[in-house]
């Protein structure tokens, strides 16, 4: 049986585990500091921890559960990493550079079962969930890459928008969030972390009840059930009415802004009537709503879909703003590399099968 990732333990779980195995309470703080502040690559680097404790950790945990398979760097500084896991599966992680800091997009599952008809991630069905340690390790790998390049900046923002549905891996997601948010370690502010869901309403209720104050984004992509079901199979299980009731509960509990993600598909969901429907759908909580219009990244396997024309994106944006909806257009990072979610992984798997 393979050893677990040390990054899979929250601070409290690490402390409890060490005490259970005969170590003093302070040992957790020492180890945590080495993991997240000094970012060690070997347990042997912990020079203020006794050898018996180091051996205990080495016998039960590992620091590395994945290796870098491919790295693509864009002219705009975006870096896409393809990591190979211990079981041979591939996942993607993306570093994006913004004026406000460095943001990392992490993956939570190997493959995806949500079934969005326009997305590269769903071309390969979900084979398993990632452990919380595997999600944390993505952040650590990116930060260590920056350290090795001599970059002094640290990862300041996280978006959980990579391959998979985060709320379908809920417990591991929450351990990940508490680990990266912990002020004794990476200390990434909750307001700098965004979790995106395709709309698992029952998990939105659960997320609303959790005290952590991270941001929520909903991949909406259509303002009515007929169209949303056509492009997102998840809408059969969680139609818009059920989804919006969970949103109401979330807003009541958190009083925090929700971002609605809306992919712009040419002649599919980009007409004025959809803009009006969308505005009407969220008008009752528009003071806590923001719409992110996302120009579509073309995927070879989905030839039926094209990016909306620039003038249609602009018209959609103007209609929403005229109706009092806060919105913006999110132009992609890494346009010259395989930066659309799932593209690089899909290409590499196809290439491997062709050999």
Curated annotation (Swiss-Prot):
- Keyword Zinc found: no
One MF term in GO for this entry? rRNA binding
Q: Which GO terms describe its cellular component?
A: cytoplasm
Q: Name one GO biological process term.
A: rRNA base methylation
The residues that the entry says bind S-adenosyl-L-methionine are 164-165, 196, 219-221, 297
Give its E.C. classification number.
2.1.1.192
> Which residues does the annotation say bind [4Fe-4S] cluster?
112, 116, 119
Keyword Manganese (UniProt): no
Q: Which residues form the active site?
A: 92, 341
Annotated disulfide bonds: 105-341
Q: Name the catalysed reactions.
A: adenosine(2503) in 23S rRNA + 2 reduced [2Fe-2S]-[ferredoxin] + 2 S-adenosyl-L-methionine = 2-methyladenosine(2503) in 23S rRNA + 5'-deoxyadenosine + L-methionine + 2 oxidized [2Fe-2S]-[ferredoxin] + S-adenosyl-L-homocysteine; adenosine(37) in tRNA + 2 reduced [2Fe-2S]-[ferredoxin] + 2 S-adenosyl-L-methionine = 2-methyladenosine(37) in tRNA + 5'-deoxyadenosine + L-methionine + 2 oxidized [2Fe-2S]-[ferredoxin] + S-adenosyl-L-homocysteine
For this protein, the record's InterPro entries field holds:
Aldolase_TIM, Methyltransferase_A, RlmN_N, RNA_MTrfase_RlmN, rRNA_lsu_MTrfase_RlmN/Cfr, rSAM
Lineage, top-rank taxon, reads Bacteria
Q: Which UniProt keywords apply?
A: 4Fe-4S, Cytoplasm, Disulfide bond, Iron, Iron-sulfur, Metal-binding, Methyltransferase, rRNA processing, S-adenosyl-L-methionine, Transferase, tRNA processing
**Subcellular locations according to the entry:** Cytoplasm
Q: What class of enzyme is it?
A: transferase
Query: What is the free-text note on the cofactor?
Result: Binds 1 [4Fe-4S] cluster. The cluster is coordinated with 3 cysteines and an exchangeable S-adenosyl-L-methionine.
Give one Pfam hit by family name: Radical_SAM
All copies of the Radical SAM core domain together span 98-330
HAMAP family documented for this protein: RNA_methyltr_RlmN
Name the PANTHER family on file: 23S RRNA METHYLTRANSFERASE, RADICAL SAM CORE DOMAIN-CONTAINING PROTEIN
Xref: NCBIfam families: rRNA_mod_RlmN
Quote additional remarks: Reaction proceeds by a ping-pong mechanism involving intermediate methylation of a conserved cysteine residue.
What job does the chain carry out?
Answer: Specifically methylates position 2 of adenine 2503 in 23S rRNA and position 2 of adenine 37 in tRNAs.
| Family designation | Belongs to the radical SAM superfamily. RlmN family.
Q: What is this protein called?
A: Probable dual-specificity RNA methyltransferase RlmN
């Amino acid at each position: 049986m393979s050893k677990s990732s040390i990054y899979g333990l929250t601070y409290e779980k690490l402390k409890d585990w060490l005490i259970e195995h005969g170590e003093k309470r302070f040992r957790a703080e020492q180890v945590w500091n080495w993991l997240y502040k000094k970012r060690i690559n070997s347990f042997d680097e912990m020079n203020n921890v006794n050898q018996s404790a180091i051996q205990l950790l080495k016998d039960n945990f590992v620091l590395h559960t994945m290796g870098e398979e491919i790295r693509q760097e864009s002219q705009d500084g975006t870096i896409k990493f393809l990591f190979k896991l211990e079981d041979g599966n591939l996942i993607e992680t993306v570093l994006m550079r913004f004026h406000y800091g460095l943001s990392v997009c992490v993956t939570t599952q190997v493959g995806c079962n949500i079934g969005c008809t326009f997305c590269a991630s769903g071309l390969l069905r979900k084979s398993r969930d990632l452990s919380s340690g595997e999600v944390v390790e993505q952040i650590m790998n990116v930060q260590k890459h920056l350290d090795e390049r001599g970059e002094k900046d640290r990862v300041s923002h996280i978006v959980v928008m990579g391959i998979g549905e985060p709320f379908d891996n809920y417990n591991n997601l929450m351990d990940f969030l508490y680990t990266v948010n912990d002020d004794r370690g990476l200390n990434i502010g909750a307001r700098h972390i965004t979790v995106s869901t395709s709309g698992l309403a029952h998990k939105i209720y659960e997320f609303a009840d959790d005290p952590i104050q991270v941001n929520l984004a909903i991949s909406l992509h259509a303002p009515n059930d007929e169209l949303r079901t056509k492009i997102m199979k998840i809408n059969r299980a969680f139609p818009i009415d059920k989804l919006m009731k969970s949103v109401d509960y979330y807003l009541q509990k958190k009083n925090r802004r929700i971002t609605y993600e809306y992919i712009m598909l040419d002649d599919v969901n980009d007409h004025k009537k959809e803009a009006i429907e969308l505005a009407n759908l969220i008008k009752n909580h528009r003071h806590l709503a923001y719409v992110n219009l996302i120009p579509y990244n073309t995927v070879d396997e989905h030839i039926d879909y094209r990016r909306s024309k620039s003038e249609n994106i602009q018209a959609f944006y103007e209609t929403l703003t005229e109706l009092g909806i806060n919105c913006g257009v999110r132009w992609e990072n890494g346009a010259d590399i395989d930066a659309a979610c799932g593209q690089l992984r899909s290409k590499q798997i196809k290439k491997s099968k062709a050999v």
